[in-house]
Every structure is written in structure tokens, then in C-alpha cells.
UniProtKB/Swiss-Prot annotation:
PROSITE patterns: ARGE_DAPE_CPG2_2. Homodimer. Binds 2 Zn(2+) or Co(2+) ions per subunit. InterPro entries: ArgE/DapE_CS (IPR001261), Bact_exopeptidase_dim_dom (IPR036264), DapE_proteobac (IPR005941), Peptidase_M20 (IPR002933), Peptidase_M20_dimer (IPR011650), Peptidase_M20A (IPR050072). Catalyzes the hydrolysis of N-succinyl-L,L-diaminopimelic acid (SDAP), forming succinate and LL-2,6-diaminopimelate (DAP), an intermediate involved in the bacterial biosynthesis of lysine and meso-diaminopimelic acid, an essential component of bacterial cell walls. This is Succinyl-diaminopimelate desuccinylase. Zn(2+) 1 binds at residues 71, 104, 167. PANTHER family: ACETYLORNITHINE DEACETYLASE, N-ACETYL-L-CITRULLINE DEACETYLASE.
Length: 381
């Protein structure tokens, strides 16, 4: 461990982890980052929307604009008794930094700041601009976070050229995978109406569970598309289903079903909605349904950002990275629709959202070098 005793990225990561910023709280994390970025020549703009703290920091006024994006909020710690160390008291054990947010994603935030400090010091006359878009609402309802900041930037025609999101993209080794896209996400909340009654008198009631079951089975078996070379086929999953009073002798009056699509670029949300409604109507259901659009699919193909990232990872780690679109959503889905090219590169994701979350300190050192090399590849050429 002695080799990391004076590590600036480790020190900053510890400072960030020690702040219990359970979503949507920030607990001063952004101020900690802002103070460092001010010293590096950044202008800081705080954007607070209701319960969410956001920061837009920018150095430079010219294009192209390279933007680090990330979040200071973390998920709840869960059962404290299952943690080997207190989740907000960061400690290093055998090269692993332990604490909530170590991998998702305070380690990445520390690497971003330190990499930027080093880059600006080495290249004070770099081309273009560097920006940070940081929110405390990524792990929560994502209403007042990145999406609101993007709306503000769009309203004043402030554009991002390239964005690197620090989500933990790696699977086995740092840099083995980068995310160059994400599937779209669409949630449906369905209420099927029936008539409550006694189970002994079914002719006097109307069981919504029985009525809805064939339609739900058809939805679950439906092949929505074949996917493509970048995305797997669209997935339909029932996430929650609730009906009944808890009594064994009562036919329920309603059935509530929550389902989610993770969809490829082969379909649109509008097409999925139309097909779902056609199936529900074909089964003669009496229902209400509302939809939540969680994000459009996006894909960043070959180009300067992906090339710069591939080169940096190869230079630092020796790995040939594999661009993938698998996994959940990230705030990249709010940045990509502006026309920006978006990638995700961060630590190994094996312990994210789990008890005893941790990250290799040596990986944070390498991640910092990767971020710095990406800046050099894009803004010094």
C-alpha cells in the first residue's frame, strides 16, 4: 500500500466517499470538486433544482467541448451489519478502497478531477473547452438532475461535442469494456379493471387476473425485434404484479402490472406502445395505462471520441477495449440526444450497489491516466 500513500486520486476519492450523499443528497461533494476545478481555471455554475444539486463547470469558450459527466449521489447502504467496514469511512485493504460509492462513482469523479488538473498544468494552451456536468440525482428519479442541466444548456445553445461518463463500465479488468451506447427504456403501468366478488360466486364477479393472463402471456412471448449488430433484441419484462385483497375468498376488482421494455434502435417507443395497446384491446380488456419514458437508445460509433478512448486504454493498460451497449441506463441517455458523442468508461462493476463496495486503488491510478490520455488525444492534436 505504501506506493499509494501520496496518491492524489486516492485522497480525493476518500474525501468524496466520506460524505454520505445518498440520493438525492450531495453533502458537499460538488463543492469539494468545484474548489479544485476553480484552481485549475474553471468557471463554476451551480444549478439547484428542487432537491437536487447540479454543477456545470467549464474552462474555455471555444469548441470542441469535452465534458466529463457523473454523479455524486450513491444508493442506500443496505444492511450495515453485512458491511465489513463502515460504508462512509473509506479504508484501503490489500489495494482495495472500500466504501459506498468507491466504484459507482466517486472513484471516477476523483480520477476525472486529478486527470484534468494534470492535463491543464501540462497543456495550458489546449484547444477547445473542458467541462464537468455533475449531478446528485442519477441514482434517484432522474427528474431534476442531468436532464434539467441539459435543458438549460440547450436553451442557451451551449453544446457538448464529446462526453465521457464515469460509470463503472469495466467487467473483469479496468478498460476491458467501454459502453458506446445504451438501450432505450420504457415503463408501462397497467391497471386491468374487473369486479370484486366472492370466490364462491364467480358469475357475480369479473376476475381481472383471469382476464389479463392471456394478454400478459402474449406480451411475454412476443418477439419485438431481432436486434442488430450493436444491440440485442428488445426485452419485455414484468417487474411487479399486484392483485387481490390478501383474502382467499375474494375475487379482486383490479390487477396492477408494471412492466419495462429495454429496446434497441430497431423500434421506437411509439411502435412498442402501439403494439401493446393492440394486444390489450384484442383481448377485450378494460384498462388504464400510463407510460414513463426513461430514455432513448443511443449509439456512438467510430469517430474521434471512441478512437481517443481506445488508444488511451491500450496505452495505459495494454488492453484492446470492447465497446458494448449492454447493461442498464445512465445519464448518457440525456446527453446523447443533443448530438454529443457519448462513451462510458469507469472501474470494474463487480461490487456496485452491493454491500462492501470496493475498487482497486491501482485501477483508480490507471483510470486517471486513461482520462488524461483521452484529453490529450482530443484536445492536443
Amino acid at each position: 500500500m505504501s506506493q499509494f500513500n501520496n496518491s492524489p486520486v486516492l485522497a480525493l476519492a476518500k474525501d468524496l466517499i466520506s460524505r454520505p450523499s445518498v440520493t438525492p443528497l450531495d453533502e458537499g461533494c460538488q463543492t469539494l470538486m468545484a474548489d479544485r476545478l476553480k484552481d485549475a481555471g474553471f468557471n463554476i455554475e451551480d444549478m439547484v433544482f428542487e432537491d437536487t444539486t447540479n454543477m456545470w463547470a467549464r474552462k474555455g469558450t471555444q469548441s470542441p467541448v469535452f465534458c466529463f459527466a457523473g454523479h455524486t449521489d450513491v444508493v442506500p447502504v443496505g444492511d450495515l451489519n453485512r458491511w465489513h467496514t463502515p460504508p462512509f469511512e473509506p479504508v484501503v485493504i490489500d489495494d482495495y478502497l472500500h466504501g459506498r460509492g468507491a466504484a459507482d462513482m466517486k472513484g471516477s469523479l476523483a480520477a476525472m478531477v486529478v486527470a484534468t488538473e494534470r492535463f491543464v498544468k501540462k497543456h495550458p494552451d489546449h484547444k477547445g473547452s473542458i467541462a464537468f456536468l455533475i449531478t446528485s440525482d442519477e441514482e434517484g428519479p432522474f427528474i431534476n438532475g442531468t436532464t434539467r442541466v441539459i435543458d438549460t444548456l440547450e436553451a442557451r445553445n451551449e453544446k457538448i461535442t464529446w462526453s465521457l461518463v464515469g460509470e463503472p463500465s469495466s467487467t473483469h479488468k479496468l478498460g476491458d469494456i467501454v459502453k458506446n451506447g445504451r438501450r432505450g427504456s420504457l415503463t408501462g403501468n397497467l391497471t386491468v379493471k374487473g369486479m370484486q366478488g366472492h370466490v364462491a360466486y364467480p358469475h357475480l364477479a369479473d376476475n381481472p387476473i383471469h382476464k389479463a393472463s392471456p394478454a400478459l402471456d402474449e406480451l411475454a412471448r412476443m418477439k419485438w425485434d431481432n436486434g442488430n449488430e450493436f444491440f440485442p433484441p428488445t426485452s419485455f419484462q414484468i417487474a411487479n404484479i399486484n392483485g387481490g385483497t390478501g383474502a382467499s375468498n375474494v375475487i379482486p376488482g383490479t390487477l396492477e402490472v408494471m412492466f419495462n421494455f429495454r429496446y434497441s434502435t430497431e423500434v421506437t417507443a411509439e411502435i412498442l406502445i402501439e403494439r401493446v395497446l393492440n394486444i390489450l384491446d384484442a383481448h377485450g380488456l378494460d384498462y388504464d395505462i400510463n407510460w414513463i419514458f426513461n430514455g432513448l437508445p443511443f449509439l456512438t460509433g467510430d469517430g474521434p471520441l471512441l478512437d481517443a478512448t481506445r488508444d488511451a486504454i491500450k496505452k495505459v493498460t495494454g488492453l484492446d477495449t470492447d465497446p458494448q451497449t449492454s447493461g442498464g441506463t445512465s445519464d448518457g441517455r440525456f446527453i446523447a440526444p443533443t448530438g454529443a458523442h457519448v462513451l462510458e468508461l469507469g472501474p470494474v462493476n463487480a461490487t456496485i450497489h452491493k454491500v462492501n463496495e470496493c475498487v482497486k486503488v491501482s485501477d483508480l491510478e490507471q483510470l486517471t491516466l486513461c482520462y488524461e490520455a483521452i484529453l490529450e488525444n482530443l484536445l492536443c492534436q
